[in-house]
Amino acid sequence: MSQIAVRTFHDIRAALLARRELALLDVREEDPFAQAHPLFATNLPLSRLELEIHARVPRRDTPITVYDDGEGLAPVAAQRLLDLGYSDVALLDGGLSGWRNAGGELFRDVNVPSKAFGELVEAERHTPSLAAEEVQALLDARADAVILDARRFDEYQTMSIPGGISVPGAELVLRVAELAPDPRTRVIVNCAGRTRSIIGTQSLLNAGIPNPVAALRNGTIGWTLAGQQLEHGQTRRFGAISQDTRKAAAQRARAVADRAGVERLDLAGLAQWQDEHDRTTYLLDVRTPEEYEAGHLPGSRSTPGGQLVQETDHVASVRGARLVLVDDDGVRANMSASWLAQMGWQVAVLDGLSDADFSERGAWSAPLPRQPRADTIDPTTLADWLGEPGTRVLAFTASANYAKRHIPGAAGVLRSQLKQALERLGTAERYVLTCGSSLLARFAVAEVQALSGKPVFLLDGGTSAWVAAGLPTEDGESLLASPRIDRYRRPYEGTDNPREAMQGYLDWELGLVEQLGRDGTHGFFVI
């Protein structure tokens, strides 16, 4: 293993304050990451490093600092990054404990920069809000009001406010005039907790729509804590809009972006930015996934604007990088960019595009390193092998997916916990690795071979191919060989969270502005 450099808390803090590019990678699984991490740390688990690193940290000489909390994952991740061609890789001195001991502030939960920024917006702009009981009274009185749900459509389908319509955050300014054409209609924006409803409401206010606007205070959590009933399985969505509506919304959005200092680029300017190899530039299409798949700018990534503002660290993992946003009408890109600029990003909107520029079709595919060689078998062969003793199937898939469906007898394993899982499972004569498609499993073949000393095979096409072949599956966690730490249980997701967890989450959000002040590196401003 190479000798790996070390960076200190003070090195990272100085770079953040100077707005120099850096990637601070927490390579633990998501749940331990969510318990405590620095503000601008981004979670990229060792388990999925090869699958995500090239998209999230595209420039190979980006200063990358890796840490864990003493689990031994960081040195492995740092060496793996060097092997993948990254040249400026260091370990955080002392790991998470070193950060804490040096006086660094630690935050819990996920997507904290975005959530803390939302709280700062409300604190500075006094974004109007209504309590759950007030909104229920409006519904009971059949008041002239419309409820717009700013979350992803799948979240909306899980649970929603009665009568609410799914309008993900970046779509609000574009579509509100058709959903509430009478300027006397009250517009209420909700999410699950606080951030997206605050940002959505303030977006409409910043854009100067004539309607009265308010956030549903504390979202579906507040609704539940008030003892009020949610709807489930709803499908109400925004519809088509007129060209006049689109044009008026574009004018409003551009004015907001200009106030926030958003830059402008044409295709020539974009090419110039992309040719500057000492800077990282992300090219992000902020329209709906359906629009992206129907036609997009080559080289762009699909990142719907509302989620980009909410989960910036999941996409742009290099703090200090440049963001270029793309749409086909100037509304969603400008509104999203206005928020990202206030969050301290250098951000530009790509202007002057024609329909012909959106020439590439299909879903976005993550850039990947060269895939390692592996001996493969087909599902029928595996089924035959499982009829005899000695074959152990290891499923390298998300624990939630494993619990829903897996090959009978397969053990659910996290790569970051592989050694412990193999010890727990005992020896086998041979191993067959799988996941949904076998892509992630392919990167684990050499590790299993090194740890077990046994023959290791890859299931061609993964568990999806097994299912497509009509072979049986089972559910449950009886053979989950790694702890369920790959997914942090968010108190605002699902319908069965304890009241104490939901209230605790709201209390935590309300304390974020104070934490931002103690940390002192955020660089946020509010227009």
Give residue spans per PLM region.
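Rhodanese-like catalytic fold shared by cysteine-dependent sulfurtransferases
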Residues: 1-23, 27-146, 150-282, 286-392, ...
